Amino acid sequence: MKARTAGFPGVEVATLLAPGHDDLTGPFWTAWPAEPLLLIALIAAAGLYGLGCYRLHRVVGARAVSSSRATAFFAGIITVALALLSPIAVYSERLFFMHMIQHLLLLLIAPPLLLLGRPLVPSLWGLPAQWRVVLGQLLVPGRPLARLGYLITTPLVAVAAFVITIAVWHLPVFYDVAQGRTFMHDLEHLLFVGTALLYWWPVIHPTGGQRRLSYARALPYLLPPFLESMLIGVLLTFADRPLYRTYVDVAMPWGFTAVTDQQLGGLIMWIPGGLFFLIPLIGLLMALLRQEDARAPGSPPTASRQPTS
């Protein structure tokens, strides 16, 4: 498909309304996808959050939303844009390893950043007052919507949804179907982001209050996707033939073959993908050991100190 010009000299905008781009002869940074609806949605989400932060600041003061949380949320929005609205999205249709980079951004980077911003309250405050009241009532604990939200963010449900989603969409039959049909590809990305938000929810706990995952429970919670990422990465890295038909008969840029491209994609999923779980696992293990040391007989009674008034 011919690339379209967006009115900027030297910048090509590849249309993603149908699969397959033939114009990848220019520099990497010149291939930009045309996704106006997604761009509008991301701008709207950022604007809603920003407006809510402003209103909360006027009502509550500087304590409403910290700058670090706001920065995390906007970084999450930028990460989604980087995955879906940058040359990465265009080149992911030709290069498997680019698609794996896109998946890492959507699964392991953007969702935690969005949740670290604690987006629920600021986003509600970004809405008109009438809408805020209606949605606030729906989210009152005990209401059906609140119960559903509690159910789907329970650790067992969240980790199962996350692991199954990753496994299914990396099976060759589903992967090739998604790459060949725009609707299925969009559905894949939607499920990636949605289940990733569910998965990271119990870890980050963006609503405050009592945590649902202790350090001891968080360790086994992080293991299934860590092992899954390692396994899929190893299988892709050491496969001696292309596993996905999508990349067999396409002209690959930069001198890649289907096998070398797949091997690099496997390494990306194996090593960087594994590190995104391994680093939190090590951090949780160290925190758990410190917690156990504090409980050991003869340890300093720091936990019993009372705050001064």
Residue ranges and their predicted role:
Residues 2-309:
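Alpha-helical membrane segments of multi-pass proteins
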